[in-house]
A protein has these predicted regions:
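Short runs within selected transmembrane alpha-helices of multi-pass transporters and secretion channels
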Residues: 65, 134-153, 160-171, 193-208, ...
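N-terminal transmembrane alpha-helices
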Residues: 2-34, 38-39, 55-67, 71, ...
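Short alpha-helical transmembrane segments in multi-pass integral membrane proteins
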Residues: 1-18, 72-139, 185-242, 298-363, ...
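Transmembrane helical elements of multi-pass membrane transporters/channels
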Residues: 13-32, 133, 167, 200-204, ...
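Helix-terminus/linker motif at the lipid-water interface of multi-pass membrane proteins
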Residues: 23, 27-45, 114-121, 177-188, ...
Length: 448
């Protein structure tokens, strides 16, 4: 009983702050979406499409953060402080370099990028302007992602939560002032939303840097300990990072193909999908803490050689995810109409959004369990090739073909298109369960 109580407490300590942080960000994103929604369908669709391309960068940085988390958690389990420091700084430098590359691309070629998403000239212009401006968030986002990973592995997930609360409040306030023109500032519309996002992301990063100065004791070498260098087991490192980068980028490209499908169906379809994003973020955010808890708890068990304990912990986390996801699906079904009624958009868009949310509620349990399996459990051993295989098969062998067929061959409406392409989650879940039960994902990382 004490073991179970200790495990549940450990899960709550890690999962609740992460879930609150994600839900908070999604809640404020919903408020931002409502503000942008007052600007009409073109701006709603434009911001949504720009966000889809920016998500490619987000998943690349997330992959780097995930590798950092795998390494830090396992080396903490091994009680190897020098490897913890090396893991953090190596991934931080790589993340900063990739952030700079994406920023240059989005600044120089925003119109060309957005032209791949929509043929509507006005929507493309709005999306290109927004994309160019929010590229200023890429560098601080990289730093904040790595710092959040470090704090969570140190079992201090409240620190990034506090920073997110303050930055989200700042973002919402600035959005209101800049979008609608308050406190003597002229209305800036979508440009105002972008500026608010950049400022709040920079503030978030600076706040976490301040927290690091008081809580980053592991990054400081004690007397007699080796200082952090970039000398490491690069073969092992790239064997973790490259599959994650491939699967995350390929998955994100698949999501962008989905966005392009919606955009080429109609502006109304694209706007309806955009309106569902805050709800999707809230639902996944409410349970994403279980995935983060899995990566830290199971990673430490694997690092210390406790494989049976890791497997038992994984099964308990999957049970928590199954119960929570079914509960949230029911809430989505009963609140969808009230949520859509908030927006000042055409009734056709509202009806589409409600139907899409119903379809989303059906696949939520599979999405959540896949998040815990692929995003936390299976990758915690560092053998990320399994995750790459699962994501590539699900997205490109099932999701994308079903999306293209249902939209352009079968000519189905957007709710049916979304539901059919989301069936890839069921395929992904089946493969993940097979990999999980075979236990070949269990692995202890080597130190230099």
């Amino acid at each position: 009983m004490k073991t179970k109580d200790h495990f549940f407490k450990a899960v709550c300590t890690l999962a609740i702050p992460v879930a609150l942080q994600s839900m908070l960000q999604s809640s404020f994103s919903m408020v931002d979406q409502i503000m942008i929604g007052q600007l009409g369908e073109i701006n709603v669709a434009g911001v949504g499409l720009a966000g889809k391309f920016a998500s490619i960068y987000s998943v690349v940085i997330s992959a780097i953060g995930a590798v950092a988390g795998i390494m830090i958690a396992q080396y903490l389990g091994q009680k190897n402080r020098s490897e913890v420091r090396r893991s953090f700084f190596t991934n931080l430098l790589l993340g900063a370099g990739i952030a700079g590359m994406f920023m240059v691309i989005c600044t120089l070629f925003p119109n060309q990028i957005m032209g791949a998403y929509t043929r509507d000239v006005q929507t493309r212009q709005a999306a290109a302007e927004y994309l160019m401006l929010i590229s200023g968030t890429f560098v601080p986002m990289a730093g904040a992602t790595l710092l959040s990973t470090l704090f969570r592995c140190l079992e201090k997930p409240r620190l990034p939560l506090y920073a997110s609360i303050l930055s989200a409040l700042l973002n919402t306030g600035l959005n209101y002032i800049m979008i609608f023109g308050k406190l003597g500032i002229s209305p800036m519309g979508v440009r105002g939303a972008a500026f608010a996002t950049v400022i709040s992301q920079c503030a978030n990063f600076l706040l976490m840097l301040l927290m690091l100065s008081k809580n980053g004791f592991l990054l400081k070498s004690n007397e007699g300990e080796p200082t952090a260098t970039l000398r490491m087991n690069w073969g092992q490192y790239w064997s973790m990072l490259l599959p994650l980068l491939v699967c995350e980028v390929v998955w994100s490209l698949g999501e962008n193909v989905y966005a392009a499908i919606y955009g080429h169906m109609s502006t109304d379809a694209s706007a309806a999908m955009t309106l569902t994003n805050p709800i999707q973020g809230l639902v996944i955010g409410a349970l994403c803490g279980l995935s983060q808890a899995a990566s830290v708890i199971i990673g430490k068990h694997l690092g210390s050689g406790e494989n049976e304990k890791a497997y038992w912990s994984a099964k308990k986390l999957l049970l928590y995810g199954a119960i929570g996801s079914v509960f949230l699906s029911i809430i989505v079904i009963f609140t969808s109409k009230a949520y859509v009624g908030i927006y000042q958009v055409d009734n056709v868009v509202k009806a589409m959004t409600v139907q899409i949310l119903f379809a989303y509620a059906v696949v939520v349990p599979f999405k959540v369990l896949n998040m815990i399996l692929g995003g936390g459990i299976i990758r915690s051993g560092g053998r990320t090739k399994y995750v790459m295989f699962i994501d590539m098969v699900g997205t490109w062998c099932f999701g994308v073909p079903l999306g293209l067929l249902s939209a352009f061959v079968w000519k189905l409406s957007i709710p049916y298109v979304y539901f059919l392409l989301s069936l890839e989650e069921c395929i992904r879940f089946g493969i993940s369960l097979i990999v999980f039960h075979r236990r070949k994902w269990m692995n202890q990382l080597e130190a230099v």
